[in-house]
Amino acid sequence: MKQEIDFIKFNPTQNMTVLVKTNHPAETYPHIAAQIMSYDNVYAEQVGFIAGAIKPEAAAHLEMAGGEFCGNACMALAAYIASENELKSTDFTEIILEVSGTDQLIRCQVKQQHNQYFCQVTMPLPEQIEQRTVKYEGIDMDIVIVRYREFIHIIIEVEAFDETMRKRAQALARLLGLTLGDKLIGILLYNAQSEELAPLIFVPQLDSLIWERGCGSGTASVGAYLAWSRQKEIVQHIKQPGGAIKVMAEWNGAELERITIEGSVGIVAQGKAFIDA
């Protein structure tokens, strides 16, 4: 028997994102997401579910299929709400969201630009940033751990995105998925010279391991790391396979004060998906 799913598909920096409009029990989210993400269905890198917000100041609640936090999905939902409200103003409109993976309300500034929506999102601040040298697969590896409440990013500076490093990153992501209780593990390969990022995102609950074409939260973590290591404000366009995402990390002299990412979102499809119930 087939089940109908109402969905919208978005393109935030080619990090193809599907948001589900119909209501479903939370325990069915991984099952629905796995089918929607597959090549023979709607096909996407991630799936989120739109629900009513609990807090009165929030316009909606976004629950990612694996309970993770996702910056690009926040942009996508803000763009959708703006489109539903027929936002035509050239000025920014603020949309506040409740989002899985963080207890902070997420503030999104949105304005329409041609056939897309330009979004600025204030991101959750990391709880801890630390630099370590770990022995992995027989070599000493310098890593930066950027820890949030329910997810963790590991930044590894590289000179090239070669196949050996990619395979090592994939094995490390799965290992951390087994040993840590986080809802999301990101391995972020970063080339400081070219300001390029190759983001690998693992969501253990979905067993989803994807080299994303653009990663908003990964971009925020790179900005946080650069501000922390240089002890100063950072404004940088982080190049990724799907395009660049701008990050602004404010440093107050002692700690990170605020992180914002900017990017464009296109609404590329809307309709019904049919999945096995």
Regions found by a protein language model. Give the residues of each.
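Active-site glycine-rich loop that binds ribose-phosphate moieties when present
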Residues: 125-144, 163-172
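Membrane helix-loop-helix hairpins that form the core translocation module of multi-pass transporters
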Residues: 116-125
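A glycine-rich beta-to-alpha transition motif near the start of alpha/beta enzyme domains, typified by
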Residues: 1-117, 147, 152-277
